[in-house]
């Protein structure tokens, strides 16, 4: 019984370490600047979504995007998504509510479980900058969002604009390849 208890304790410690790492990444990447609470996990509205329609609404052309509730509330936040759906949102920019819980192995629509008609997260969500983070880092963020936050019931108005509008903007030609090309390139120092 002691061996089981010890293994269980190690598993709990590993999960807690992953959550703490995810918290550090969320704070250091300033998720709270848009999603609520600035960079302070002790703030009253930490990551529970846009509350001020003037300062946290992002006008982009004729559309407006609004930062969502990231807490694990089932009705108004991320509670109905799996950690893999959150991972896919961070890696591929896919809206978790419109993407199945599957491992994606390609960024080409219709291949490797990538949706044929993808619906992307709206700008200014910086998923394009995050896509080259390690799997471990992205899953740590997902773990923090799912298991490290208390659920808060706070409905944020949906962003305006057709869901397929962003698909024409998120192309390899505009944002570069994933994964990033190997180091060094012709523009970098280093031994080849």
Feature annotation, model-predicted:
Residues 1-3:
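Bacterial N-terminal signal peptides
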Residues 7-27, 41, 80:
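Electrostatic cytochrome c docking/interface patches
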Residues 14-17, 36-65, 84, 95-192:
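Flexible coil segments in periplasmic/lumen-exposed cytochrome c-class electron-transfer proteins
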Residues 21, 71-78, 126-131:
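Second-shell loop/turn segments in exported
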Residues 26, 86-89, 144:
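Conserved hydrophobic/aromatic "anchor" residues
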Residues 27-30, 38, 74:
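Short pre-active-site segment immediately N-terminal to redox-active cysteine/selenocysteine motifs
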Residues 33:
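Short, cysteine/histidine-rich loop/knuckle motifs that typically chelate Zn2+
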Residues 69, 76-82, 94:
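Mid-length scaffold segments of soluble, non-membrane domains
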């Amino acid at each position: 019984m002691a061996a089981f208890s010890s293994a269980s304790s190690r598993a709990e410690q590993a999960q807690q370490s992953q959550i703490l790492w995810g918290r550090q990444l969320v704070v250091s990447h300033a998720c709270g600047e848009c999603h609520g609470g600035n960079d302070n996990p002790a703030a009253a509205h930490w990551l529970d979504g846009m509350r001020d329609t003037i300062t946290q609404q992002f006008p982009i052309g004729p559309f407006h995007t609004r930062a969502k509730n990231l807490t694990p509330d089932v009705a108004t936040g991320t509670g109905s998504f799996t950690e893999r759906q959150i991972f896919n949102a961070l890696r591929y920019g896919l809206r978790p509510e419109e993407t199945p819980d599957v491992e994606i192995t390609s960024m080409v629509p219709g291949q490797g479980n990538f949706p044929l008609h993808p619906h992307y997260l709206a700008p200014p969500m910086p998923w394009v900058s995050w896509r080259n983070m390690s799997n471990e880092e992205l899953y740590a963020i997902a773990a923090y969002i799912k298991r490290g936050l208390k659920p808060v019931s706070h409905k944020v108005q949906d962003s305006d604009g057709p869901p397929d509008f962003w698909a024409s903007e998120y192309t390899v030609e505009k944002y570069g390849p994933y994964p990033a090309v190997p180091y060094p390139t012709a523009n970098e120092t280093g031994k080849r």
